[in-house]
């Protein structure tokens, strides 16, 4: 189900977590896991096993935040959510590019 990812893919997870924390979208790793509808230990288990966060989990988080964005009328909240969604989408894109290079053997 999961393939071992290079260190730079796991570094993307850490950068994303820092970005989401700075935006105030998540308060902790446990909060990130909850928002992705995963168990509390999902992030740490994946990291300790040498994997990165699953793209499907990140896509679920984008869908959830998009729903919150559509329901919100607060300009600041909407800006924060748009920034978070953009950061997650950039992470997904970067992971896909890295995975593509792995398939090509580079």
For the regions a protein language model found, what residue spans apply to each?
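Short alpha-helical "recognition helix" segments of helix-turn-helix
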Residues: 32-33
């Amino acid at each position: 189900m999961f393939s071992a990812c290079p260190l730079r893919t796991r570094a993307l997870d850490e950068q994303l977590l820092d970005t989401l924390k700075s935006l105030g979208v998540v308060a902790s790793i446990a909060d990130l896991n909850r928002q992705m509808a995963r168990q509390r230990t999902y992030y740490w288990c994946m990291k300790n096993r040498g994997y990165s966060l699953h793209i499907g989990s990140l896509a679920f988080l984008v869908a959830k935040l998009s729903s919150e964005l559509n329901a919100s009328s607060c300009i600041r909240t909407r800006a924060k959510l748009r920034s978070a969604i953009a950061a997650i989408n950039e992470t997904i894109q970067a992971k896909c590019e890295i995975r593509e290079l792995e398939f090509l053997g580079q």
